[in-house]
Regions:
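Catalytic-core region of carbohydrate-active enzymes that cleave or remodel glycosidic bonds
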Residues: 39-40, 91-153, 166-180
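Glycoside hydrolase catalytic-domain groove-lining segments
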Residues: 48-49, 61-120
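Aromatic-lined carbohydrate-recognition surfaces of secreted/lumenal glycan-active proteins
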Residues: 1-3, 19-61, 112-113, 117, ...
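Acidic, His- and aromatic-enriched active-site or binding-groove loops in soluble protein domains
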Residues: 29, 69-78, 138, 145
């Protein structure tokens, strides 16, 4: 009815072109998630369910009042689809990963935390991946997934989604950086803090990142990985 339509528009948000979009309430979001969970359970799902909470922070409480087992986030600290190769030192951009409602929402620490996609997009440098993973671990993330898909036929440029560019064939230095980042994800303690840039370019057991050297490095006595030329000597050369 016209009256119902007016009530709906009262719960709407005006966007730039003057049109309106419906903005759900906290209770509606909670009910929607619970209906999905019920449907998945009836379909036989027995695996943990994660829900993306990195948007619509005004209803963040609703996410944590459901029975989802985990929450998901993403990070593109220098943007996406710039149309050009970005230049510069982006390490200060990844000093912190702040979750605005972390200390405001009841039950925040009772749900697992996952990064469902991340990438320092539009760069050719090899120093960023371990730094981002370091910050994710400081923020308490348990699962970290990098966004990239480069079929071999288009891997030279990734024309399908050119803002992402990571593969062993054409960006071996970045691939090694990602390998080092994987080591960091598995060894760095959740919640551990490593200070601010530039102090946090050295972290954990043998990890180092450098903008001036375009370098990711792991040198812990058992493993010596480096993404670019380095003057570092192996901790244990035997």
């Amino acid at each position: 009815t016209e009256e119902a339509a007016d009530q709906t528009l009262n719960q709407a948000e005006v966007i730039e072109d003057g049109s309106k979009i419906y903005v759900p309430t906290k209770e509606e979001v909670k009910a929607y998630i619970n209906r999905m969970l019920k449907s998945m359970s009836k379909a036989g799902n027995r695996k943990p369910v994660f829900y993306n909470v990195s948007h619509n922070g005004y209803v963040a409480e609703a996410y944590y009042e459901t029975t989802v087992q985990g929450t998901t986030y993403q990070w593109y600290p220098i943007g996406l689809v710039s149309g050009q190769t970005q230049q510069g030192n982006f390490l200060p951009y990844v000093d912190r990963y702040d979750i605005s409602f972390a200390d405001k929402v009841k039950g925040f620490d009772k749900k697992a935390r996952m990064i469902y996609e991340f990438d320092p997009a539009d760069i050719m440098y090899s120093y960023m991946y371990p730094a981002m993973v370091r910050t994710f671990r400081t923020a308490g993330f348990q699962w970290i997934t990098q966004f990239s898909y480069d079929p071999m036929d288009i891997a030279y440029a990734n024309t399908e989604y050119q803002t992402h560019f990571l593969n062993l064939a054409y960006t071996p230095h970045k691939a090694i950086s990602m390998k080092i980042a994987s080591e960091a994800a598995q060894s760095l303690k959740r919640g551990a803090s490593y200070g601010s840039y530039p102090q946090d370019t050295l972290f954990g057991e043998g990890f180092r990142v450098s903008y001036t050297e375009d370098l990711s490095e792991l040198n812990n006595g058992n493993k010596f990985y480096y993404s670019n030329t380095t003057r570092t000597q192996p901790k244990d050369a035997s």
